[in-house]
């Protein structure tokens, strides 16, 4: 499985925003470690926004283009459609629900068979979760203290498109997410513009 291997904190500082959600990710940014502030060209700005969006979901370029192409074909705004498709990836929803402390950990949980969708094991991080699908922790995996602690200590859970069931160690996608509900700082219009001449 192809994956992004760059150090998370270094990536955050290079992109100028905290894409991994860790409170210490931008700690050294004030010491000149953050990306160069020089003026970017229009292309450079579009490229930066694309890199930021990819980094939030840790999706490789080849697969990211597939999402963009699919979003372009949708009837709704391309940017909105793209974000929805990325938000509904299984690894992302495992992370949002609180099973993993990061999207990388959530992805590993999926790959190693710890996650069930509607009671069946799914080991593909890119699996597209549909409205009404239940995401749960495999019975055997509920003995893992790390997974349990992650799930129960996520007190700041605030995703209105996900219903979290702490007693059942599960979550359900109850509706499609709205663009403004995705906790990301990206200008998706610029991302679409970046690909408009090549796709």
UniProtKB/Swiss-Prot annotation:
Keyword list, A-Z: Ribonucleoprotein, Ribosomal protein, RNA-binding, rRNA-binding
One Pfam family cited in the UniProt record for this chain: Ribosomal_S4
GO biological process, one term: ribosomal small subunit biogenesis
GO cellular component entries: small ribosomal subunit
Domain of life: Bacteria
SUPFAM superfamilies: Alpha-L RNA-binding motif
Entry's transmembrane regions: none
GO molecular-function terms, A-Z: rRNA binding; structural constituent of ribosome
Family in the record: Belongs to the universal ribosomal protein uS4 family.
Subunit structure comment from the entry: Part of the 30S ribosomal subunit. Contacts protein S5. The interaction surface between S4 and S5 is involved in control of translational fidelity.
Protein name: Small ribosomal subunit protein uS4B
Originating organism: Alkaliphilus metalliredigens (strain QYMF)
